[in-house]
Amino acid sequence: MIDEILPKLVQYWYIVLPTLLIIKHVVSYINTQRLMRKFRAKPVTNVLNDGFFGIPNGIKAIKEKNKGRAQEYNDEKFAAGPKPKVGTYLFKLFTKDVLVTKDPENIKAILATQFEDFSLGKRLDFFKPLLGYGIFTLDGEGWKHSRAMLRPQFAREQVGHVKLIEPHFQSLKKHIIKNKGQFFDIQELFFRFTVDSATEFLFGESVESLKDESIGYDQQDFDFDGRKNFAEAFNKAQEYLGTRAILQLFYWLVNGADFKKSVAEVHKFTDYYVQKALDATPEELEKHSGYIFLYELVQQTRDPKVLRDQSLNILLAGRDTTAGLLSFALFELARNPEVWSRLREEIGDKFGLDEDATIEGISFESLKQCEYLKAVVNECLRMYPSVPRNFRIATKHTTLPRGGGPDGKDPIFIKKGAVVSYGINSTHLDPMYYGPDARLFNPDRWSKPETKKLGWAFLPFNGGPRICLGQQFALTEASYVLVRMIQNFKELELTPNTVYPPRRLTNLTMSLYDGAYIKVN
């Protein structure tokens, strides 16, 4: 029987294949409708045109990312639906249905109230070549174990210790003075500054990337195999990871020689420090003065792979997020001299300026008392969140509270395995939550009573069980550097004709695509 039918099926494949696809689609549609009724959900209000299996969407997303317009592209998608004010839309991306939301109620459900309904999905596959099995790539028990292991390393006494930052600020200051009176890219310096401070916190020994020949140092004094190419390799590897995430099911296409070479350079750099920690005797680990993240971790595990993976996960956060925040802050402060002047007044009253500046009183506690400084930092985090967009995968059939029906206020059905992306950057710039001036840099908004009630509409450090462990570390370091900049420099100036809003480079974290070219007077 089968022997008779099979040749005919093969002969008429051009009829059979489309027929099977249609049947599959109809069965899937009927099943989805049944489940929607069961969960009392409504169809998604904004369903966008997909093109051919979402392939044009995917290609456009990669092109826009490479042009520094990933966030603008996402905002355009929100505006393209029949109900633009509904903060959720559905579209295809490289054959995969993706639900994108900026609705705080949906984000709250994904990250907190329905936390168990969602996982990281294929994030481990996307990011594993570089980051391995770390706190940012693991789910379930692996993630819980990582978090339990790392949480003590971010205790208040560790993150509040600002004295380690000052020597690196002095190196940064020399570079700024070297460029006095001319425009220079301070973002490039901030990335070097944060890798210097992060490696000292993590490994007990700074990579000292700021101490170069231009300010009178010999780089050979700090050299080791893997150090020289680390920064460039780390940046390049992250670009590849960002593209792998966009490609979804086809992430494996990005696995070429250049990517592997970048990953190998980063691993060589990290392995140097891991091996030093493993080679240290228990007595050396115990008596080492000051706090060293890796030495504390070695007392919990001696697996070099675990040590490398967790260190790299934390290094990513410690370097990139703080450097991005500082760069965006200086960019906006150079654009808004009146804000810089008000900061000078506040910091001058608390810690002194210029020749009268002191650092003895700058601490975790005193920085939290600088209200206008906190407002400026919050406004930078609002407009330029370090991780502007993220995603989850549904672990079972479930719902999200809003985004369905004629007005977008009804629950929507989320099928098991569905990709759900949440766009924090789009939430932070939505007039519904921040008023008509949502796209303007305005630190004064943080003194208004309504801003205190934002809840899940302000989420610079994620939320729920996976909220960022290093939140206070990043805020303390960024605030300290801003205070020291304010104490030492009277005026900032931005390059004339600078494009605004700025183009943003979005990989695993966000930074300025064209750098932050300022002049310090």
UniProtKB/Swiss-Prot annotation:
Subcellular location: Membrane
Pfam families assigned to the protein according to its UniProt record, in alphabetical order: p450 (PF00067)
Keyword NAD: no
Keywords (A to Z) from UniProt: Heme, Iron, Membrane, Metal-binding, Monooxygenase, Oxidoreductase
Cofactor: heme
Induction entry: By N-alkanes.
GO molecular function: heme binding; iron ion binding; oxidoreductase activity, acting on paired donors, with incorporation or reduction of molecular oxygen, reduced flavin or flavoprotein as one donor, and incorporation of one atom of oxygen
Residues reported in the UniProt entry to bind heme: 468
Superkingdom, natural source: Eukaryota
GO-annotated cellular components: membrane
EC number: 1.14.14.-
Family, per entry: Belongs to the cytochrome P450 family.
Function text: Together with an NADPH cytochrome P450 the enzyme system catalyzes the terminal hydroxylation as the first step in the assimilation of alkanes and fatty acids.
Protein name: Cytochrome P450 52A9
Species classification: Eukaryota, Fungi, Dikarya, Ascomycota, Saccharomycotina
Annotated gene: CYP52A9
